[in-house]
From Swiss-Prot:
Protein name from the UniProt record: Apovitellenin-1
Family: Belongs to the apovitellenin family.
Cross-referenced InterPro entries: Apo-VLDL-II
Molecular function (Gene Ontology), one example: enzyme inhibitor activity
Protein induction: By steroids (estrogen).
Length: 105
């Protein structure tokens, strides 16, 4: 049983999500910069599948996903991926301006 709990905790940390946030927004409602769309959706599907088999295990998943450690890790990932996305968008704009300015396209 201990290995099962460790596996579930590792899965939740890997997905870095909180289940209630997944249900609050659909995939199409999210912005371009939100890289957490796919882990959130996957966590939602896993939660729903576990809930149909064992509501008690689903409640355990929900409790683990709402811990401060998981929320902190998720917030860190969101913050860092947002920074990376902004930098990539700035780089693309610079490349476009060089392309249009120097080459005249």
């Amino acid at each position: 049983m201990v290995q099962y709990r460790e596996l579930v905790i590792a899965l939740i940390l890997l997905l870095s999500t909180t289940v209630p946030e997944v249900h609050s927004r659909s995939l199409s409602d999210r912005g371009r910069r939100d890289w957490m769309v796919y882990p959130d959706a996957l966590a939602s599907y896993i939660y729903e599948a576990v809930n149909t088999v064992s509501p008690r295990a689903a409640q355990f998943l929900l409790d683990v996903s709402q811990t401060t450690v998981v929320s902190g890790a998720r917030n860190l990932l969101i913050r860092e991926t947002t920074k990376i996305t902004i930098l990539v968008e700035q780089m693309v704009e610079k490349i476009r301006s060089i392309w249009n300015g120097k080459l005249g396209y």
